[in-house]
Amino acid sequence: MSAKKPMALVILDGWGYREDNANNAINNARTPVMDSLMANNPHTLISASGMDVGLPDGQMGNSEVGHTNIGAGRIVYQDLTRITKAIMDGEFQHNKVLVAAIDKAVAAGKAVHLMGLMSPGGVHSHEDHIYAAVEMAAARGAEKIYLHCFLDGRDTPPRSAEASLKRFQDLFAKLGKGRIASIVGRYYAMDRDNNWDRVEKAYDLLTLAQGEFTYDSAVEALQAAYAREENDEFVKATEIRAAGQESAAMQDGDALLFMNYRADRARQITRTFVPDFAGFSRKAFPALDFVMLTQYAADIPLQCAFGPASLENTYGEWLSKAGKTQLRISETEKYAHVTFFFNGGVENEFPGEERQLVASPKVATYDLQPEMSSKELTDKLVAAIKSGKYDAIICNYPNGDMVGHTGVYEAAVKACEAVDECIGRVVEAIKEVDGQLLITADHGNAEMMIDPETGGVHTAHTSLPVPLIYVGNKAISLKEGGKLSDLAPTMLALSDLDIPADMSGQVLYS
């Protein structure tokens, strides 16, 4: 069997394009490989945000959305737009699963709890959805409505939670019932790297109403956290309970609506509420009517309000149907993105699909090790390219995004330099086997490390375009005006394969 010449796609997570060098970790890093590719190879810029990826206009892209669009080869309307539309149409307020959970709790005189990432960030959740759910619970007769706020500071400025908390305090005052019952940073409640000691702190706060602190109001608790030098993301578990208020600990028969719609950081805390769980020993395990807003994983035996919209003939499925082999490879932090999200929400491998996982380093925050596990990842990727086993390879380097999120500029520069070195090795390997390579990003981040409006640290993604570079033996030029959903059709065309009718993306070269 002759060696295969792979079509590789390397996704540089968080590597956006911005001409201005000010506070731009990518432009100011020493990146001779990427500089040379942008100067000498076919290249263009493509859109990775807003309506072009199925998000609201102007909304920054993110990894889940980016990989879903890339793999689908069509614009995929994201849960954010889908749920917002349902609220506007009135469909949300009549959602059978939400209605049943609320009504059951109301009939039994029990509480309705809502938890989720409380911010307008729009990556994992949107506070507008939580607002609508609180209003819905109140309208359906719930008297005890408890809101458990996971604070952001990652997809939003590091100290921006106060506006959101005030908004909900005002809502409860207007309704004359319900209250904010707890606050905790997403570092604890939304871990995705099996740091169960963090998750346990959030779980105890929810189920036992036990935190490290108790304050009368959420805003007071937040100000105390800032005084302890804890930004939103890292706020320690705090119970909110004024004198004379009853505990909001979760009880048998209560309803719990988890209002995050993005799966990867919702899974761990959700699994703590499922009978079969071994992450830590639970001090309490209330029997709740738990509703996931969307399906976080097929193997979680809980109901969800908005089931997955199935995507037919994604890039991975189409390759599989054509009898081709493919490899998906990344570090822990972005492994779900090159597998589950890239496959349109399909958990299992397609026939002919292999997966390799490289463990991300166990550090508190990635500015402490900006290169992450890029060397080991590249060793495996280069070996895979040279193996002759794969028709297609999809790889993600997480550094630009994961280190960009820390807000530590010097570390982000080092992260970009580490990735550039790795890309040099990948390009060399592709040329050696006469393969083809597209280099792109799923969204921006590291190109803007200071917020131009506030002058503070910028830890969030951007809505700037991302590069697309071709390395290979075809004499092509890349078109302008493309978007992430054009990549799958482009790769199929480069591989001389048919493009399924389901893919509405365009081929980006001529």
Curated annotation (Swiss-Prot):
Protein residues bound to Mn(2+) 1: 401, 405, 461
Top-level taxon: Bacteria
Coiled-coil intervals: none
Residues where substrate binds: 124, 154-155, 186, 192, 262-265, 334
Transmembrane segments: none
A GO molecular-function descriptor: manganese ion binding
Alphabetical list of Pfam families matching this protein: iPGM_N (PF06415), Metalloenzyme (PF01676)
Record text on cofactor binding: Binds 2 manganese ions per subunit.
GO biological process: carbohydrate metabolic process; glucose catabolic process; glycolytic process
Broad EC category: isomerase
Binding-site residues, Mn(2+) 2: 13, 63, 442-443
Xref: InterPro entries: Alkaline_phosphatase_core_sf (IPR017850), BPG-indep_PGM_N (IPR011258), Metalloenzyme (IPR006124), PGAM_B_sf (IPR036646), Pgm_bpd_ind (IPR005995)
Cofactor(s), by name: Mn(2+)
Gene Ontology cellular component list: cytosol
Reactions mediated catalytically: (2R)-2-phosphoglycerate = (2R)-3-phosphoglycerate
EC nos: 5.4.2.12
Sorted UniProt keywords: Glycolysis, Isomerase, Manganese, Metal-binding
Pathway the protein acts in: Carbohydrate degradation; glycolysis; pyruvate from D-glyceraldehyde 3-phosphate: step 3/5
Catalytic residue list: 63
Quaternary structure (record): Monomer.
Function: Catalyzes the interconversion of 2-phosphoglycerate and 3-phosphoglycerate.
Family from the record: Belongs to the BPG-independent phosphoglycerate mutase family.
Protein name: 2,3-bisphosphoglycerate-independent phosphoglycerate mutase
Species annotation: Vibrio cholerae serotype O1 (strain ATCC 39315 / El Tor Inaba N16961)
Gene label: gpmI
